[in-house]
Each structure stands twice: as C-alpha cells, then as structure tokens.
C-alpha cells in the first residue's frame, strides 16, 4: 500500500472532513490492555493454558483480526501512534517515555467535534499525557475500572453519544502474586528457557491476563445494559508482553496484538479476518464509523470495509519501529512485514540488546534471569537463547509461513535473496519518507564490553 507523507501543520478542522452525523451514532467502548501478547490468549492460541472465557464469548459476537499490529513495541510511542494516526518518526514520540509533538491533533478530538463525549479511564495515553489529552472526563484509577465507568455513566447527562476509552494496566509488570495457575503445570514456549522461576513468572503473567478477561466481561455486559445494540466495542493491547523477544523487539511476539471488534448489526458474529491492520488505523476507522473522514495526511486509514465484511484485504505491508527505552534499552530496530515474510534491520548491531528485565531482574518481572544464567552454564541450548537475546545480526529475515516464531534467520539463504533485497529497499525508502533519523537516544552497551547486567544501573 502506497501512502502519501507530508508535514501536518493544519488544525483539526483541516485534518478531519465530512462531519455529517448519522441518525444514531454508535456509542464506543475501546478497551486497551498493557503488554498482552497475542499468543497468550485462546483467541489465537488453542494450546495456551490461559483461560479467557469472556473474551471467547465476546468474540462469538464479533470479528477477530488474525493479523493486527502496533507501530512500536513500547508504551509511549505505541499509544502516541494510536492517538495521532501517525508513525513514531513523524510524531516525535520515538523512544519510550516520550510524547508526540503537540502540533499534531489527537484523533479522539474528532469524536468530540462530532458530538461525542469522550471519557477515559486508567492508562489510555502514556503517563502525564493522559491529563493533557483534553478528554471530557478522566479517571486515572487503575483498580475498579468497571465501577469507575459505571459511576461516570450514572452521573453524566444523557443525550450525546459517548466514547469510553478504558485502559487496563495489566498484564504490565509487576505481575500479580495472586496466582490462578499452578507454576508446576505451566508449559514454557520454546524460545524461552524452561526453569522453575520462568514457570513461576509465567503463572503470574497468565493470572493477570485472566484478570483482564474478567474485567472485559464486566465492561461488555455494562455496554449491553446501557447501550443495547447501539455500540461498537474494540479490544486490543498496546504491544507484546515483557518477556525476552517480545516487548522492545520487532518479532511478532512484540508487534502482533489481539484485536477484537463487536458492532451489533454491522459485523457478522463469530468471524475472523486475515486483513493486516495497524494501530494507526483504529481511530481513523472509528471516525469513519461515526460518519467522518480522515485526510490523507495520516499514516493510518479506515478499515471499515473489513469490519463490514466487504473485503479481507487491507495493508500489503506493516512497518514497525523501536527506538529504545531509557538507559536500559538502547537498541533501535526497524522492520517491514508482509503476509509471509519479515525483514528486520538492527541499526547498531555492534551493541548489546538489553532491557529492564535482564538488567534489573525485579521480583514479579525479570527475576527469572538469574536462573537463566545458571542454566546456561551447563545447557548449550539455554546458552544459545541468551546469546541470541544479547547479540543480534545487522539484518534478519524470516519466512513466517514455515517459521512463525522467527527462530531461523534466512538472511544468507540464496533462495530468498530476491525477496530480501526487495524488502530491504522497501524499508529503506519508507524510513526516508518518514524522516527517520535512526537516532540513538542514550549511550549503548558495546558488545566489546561486559553484558549490561554486569554493569548495573547506569
């Protein structure tokens, strides 16, 4: 898909056009989780041990996207891309804990201009940006989300349609210590190291996901009670989980996310689509649903036709970027993915990849890392996983049809050289179009020195 890119200097009125309202605009419920991997819900993985009965029930009423992706696998740039419809290099929110340039309109304001009351709960934007978004109502409490939404609905003046943006902190670390799963029974993915400590932490992580499921179920029932069939519900996550090769990485474990949409009377129930969509497309789609159009100045586009079953095709390519997270993750990466292949560019492979998990090793987060180091001393397979985690080649290429977990790098395989060159050139052209400066935002950890954990917190 070829898109036009240009600087956005016009106001919101020039950004959004065609504000004609439908006779009965649907209320909107957008439920966002934090660090939830797509493989860790039975919506996508029948072999997972995670129980999500509510999400499975809700999915029978709507459409599940098999190939939904985010713009960047860290909270701040991912959520900035969601709210602006722009990729990180354009918004200025590239590294984690950074914010978009205020000259770029936030797309939920288009809902407000169209008569919607926009209420946000929990973590919708990142950090202090929640207070600067101009929501009509904001409650920052992370606990009791359904109770907070109910109280808001009870006290608001009826009349205007409402958009409820609900941000659940789970399953972001620290994970819960109230276990719903027995660690001894946990099956560990092959790309992680199977230790007692890994299983204990997976049990915590899984328990948080089931907690999310319970909350989503309550929110869904509340929407049905208050809105009848006149609502559209979106469920998704800002990126993959805080595990090695997931969050802060451009493997599918980091960039591919659950996406479920329910829209009674418009979306065929119990359906799935292979259309590739990005988080930058979500708000353009919602604006389209309520009767508005978004200009071509955005990177995002409406996939309303996919929702309505008119097409099963959308994006030909998904571009993703990662630019780092403070002093503990200084490893910029870029990638392009199509329906079958992925090309990854590690911009500075002379440095170690690292992040908060392996450096801090906090309880209920990354404390399993000590057991990994111990296992690697006697187990060559464990040592290979750790080496792959820390040291990356300049380029990676995967055939996702035969290697969906991206374990075999085919960058030097003669059979794929034509496809590799095509995707290499495609990514380079897109980066230039975006104005990507390939910046290092902190001092990296050179592989000529000790591993980051050995240096401690800088």
Predicted regions: what they are:
Residues 2-4, 19-396, 404-425, 429-432, ...:
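Formylglycine-dependent sulfatase
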Residues 10-19:
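Hydrophobic h-region of N-terminal signal peptides that target proteins for export
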Residues 401:
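C-terminal helical cap and adjacent loop that interface with cofactors, partners, or active-site loops
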């Amino acid at each position: 898909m070829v898109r036009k890119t240009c600087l956005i200097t016009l106001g919101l009125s020039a950004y959004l056009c065609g504000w004609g309202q439908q006779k009965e605009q649907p209320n909107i419920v957008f439920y966002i989780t934090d660090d939830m991997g797509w493989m860790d819900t039975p919506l996508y993985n029948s072999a997972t041990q995670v129980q999500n009965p509510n999400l499975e029930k809700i999915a029978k009423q709507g459409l599940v996207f098999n190939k939904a992706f985010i713009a960047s696998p860290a909270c701040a740039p991912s959520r900035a891309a969601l709210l602006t419809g722009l990729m990180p290099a354009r918004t200025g929110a590239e590294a984690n804990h950074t914010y978009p340039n205020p000259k770029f309109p936030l797309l939920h304001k288009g809902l407000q201009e169209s008569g919607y009351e926009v209420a946000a709960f929990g973590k919708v934007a990142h950090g202090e940006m929640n207070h600067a978004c101009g929501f009509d109502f904001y409650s920052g409490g992370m606990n009791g989300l359904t109770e907070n939404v109910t109280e808001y609905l009870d006290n608001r003046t009826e009349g205007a349609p409402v958009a409820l943006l609900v941000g659940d902190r789970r399953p972001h670390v620290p994970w819960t210590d109230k276990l719903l799963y027995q660690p001894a029974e946990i099956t560990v993915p092959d790309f992680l190291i199977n230790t007692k400590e890994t299983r204990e932490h997976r049990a915590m992580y899984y328990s948080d996901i089931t907690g999310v499921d319970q909350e989503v179920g309550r929110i869904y029932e509340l929407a049905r009670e208050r809105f009848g069939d006149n609502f559209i519900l979106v469920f998704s996550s800002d990126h993959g989980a805080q595990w090695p090769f997931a969050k802060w990485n451009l493997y599918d474990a980091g960039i591919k996310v659950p996406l479920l949409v329910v829209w009674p009377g418009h979306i065929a129930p119990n359906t799935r689509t292979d259309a590739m969509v990005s988080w930058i497309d979500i708000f353009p789609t919602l604006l389209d649903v309520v009767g508005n159009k978004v200009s071509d100045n955005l990177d995002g586009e409406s996939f309303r036709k996919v929702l309505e079953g008119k097409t099963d095709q959308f994006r030909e390519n998904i571009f993703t970027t990662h630019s780092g997270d403070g002093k503990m993750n200084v490893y910029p990466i870029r990638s392009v993915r199509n329906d079958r292949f992925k090309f990854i560019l590690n911009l500075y492979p002379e440095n170690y990849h690292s992040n908060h998990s392996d450096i801090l090793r906090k309880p209920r987060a990354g404390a399993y890392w000590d057991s990994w180091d111990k296992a690697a001393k006697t187990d060559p397979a464990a040592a290979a996983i750790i080496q792959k985690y820390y040291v990356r080649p300049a380029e990676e290429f995967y055939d996702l049809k035969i290697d969906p977990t991206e374990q075999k790098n085919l960058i030097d395989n003669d059979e794929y050289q034509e496809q590799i060159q095509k995707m290499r050139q495609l990514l380079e052209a897109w980066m230039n179009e975006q104005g990507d400066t390939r910046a290092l935002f902190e001092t990296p950890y050179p592989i000529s020195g000790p591993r980051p954990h050995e240096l401690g917190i800088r």
